[in-house]
Amino acid sequence: MSAFACSAVAAPARGAIKANSSSVCAIENGKAVAVGTSKQVGAFKPVFAAAKAAKATTFSISCSAASDEVPDMGKRKLMNLLLLGAIAGPTIGAGGPFVSFLVPPKSGGGAGAGQAAKDAAGNDIKVEKWLETXKPGDRSLAQGLKGDATYLIVKEDGTLEKYGLNAVCTHLGCVVPWNQSEGKFMCPCHGSQYDRTGKVVRGPAPLSLALAHVNVLEDGVVAFEPWTETDFRTNTAPWWK
């Protein structure tokens, strides 16, 4: 069985906020259970509590495999919970808008009217505040179209990229973390990889990550809008239409 060590870091941070998955081996009825038992463990509670205390609005996630094996289905579900649960943490108790993040979307795309990007507390993201903590090269998750976890990208000049990337892997729907050291999005479930623009560079994922337009409204709110034109990475029609 593959082991993963995952950490969630909140900003503004009061020290690192971490959760180690080594004590968890499976998901039982949607909840983490301890190795060899059916007793539920509170592996995520310290992350949620610390994030709430820090009044964090952005999170970065890092994961590293303890072996090169492909994680089993329990690990896959656990990874999704860790990646998105860290974002949902401040609002789980109140049943806030990020609770839906705990269930991977059935579709990787997004269609319909543009909508405000939401932060970890479920509030509209204001570009000025976001850029105070998200530095050049940053790729952090926000709630996007259809509630999908979507990366906002900060360019090297410190401004927001004009597109966002749907974080759902096009293989089997895992949430794909950004690997800063490798400069790629690397899926922990079956090894698919995507470059900085979300273009697939290694299977088994068959397609690139879905795109969404990113606009800044007059009041400074960041908004996502559906991407319906040609995919600039492949020069083809968008598969997520």
Swiss-Prot record:
Annotated disulfide bonds: 174-189
Reaction catalyzed: 2 oxidized [plastocyanin] + a plastoquinol + 2 H(+)(in) = 2 reduced [plastocyanin] + a plastoquinone + 4 H(+)(out)
The keyword Metal-binding belongs to this UniProt entry's keyword annotation: yes
InterPro entries named among the record's database cross-references: Cyt_b6_f_Rieske (IPR023960), Rieske_2Fe-2S (IPR017941), Rieske_2Fe-2S_sf (IPR036922), Rieske_Fe-S_prot (IPR014349), Rieske_Fe-S_prot_C (IPR005805)
Keyword field: 2Fe-2S, Cyanelle, Disulfide bond, Electron transport, Iron, Iron-sulfur, Membrane, Metal-binding, Plastid, Thylakoid, Transit peptide, Translocase, Transmembrane, Transmembrane helix, Transport
Places the protein is found: Plastid, Cyanelle thylakoid membrane
Gene3D superfamilies listed in its UniProt record: Rieske [2Fe-2S] iron-sulphur domain, Single helix bin
Subunit organization: The 4 large subunits of the cytochrome b6-f complex are cytochrome b6, subunit IV (17 kDa polypeptide, petD), cytochrome f and the Rieske protein, while the 4 small subunits are petG, petL, petM and petN. The complex functions as a dimer.
Function: Component of the cytochrome b6-f complex, which mediates electron transfer between photosystem II (PSII) and photosystem I (PSI), cyclic electron flow around PSI, and state transitions.
Entry protein name: Cytochrome b6-f complex iron-sulfur subunit 2, cyanelle
Species lineage: Eukaryota, Glaucocystophyceae, Cyanophoraceae, Cyanophora
Encoding gene per record: petC-2
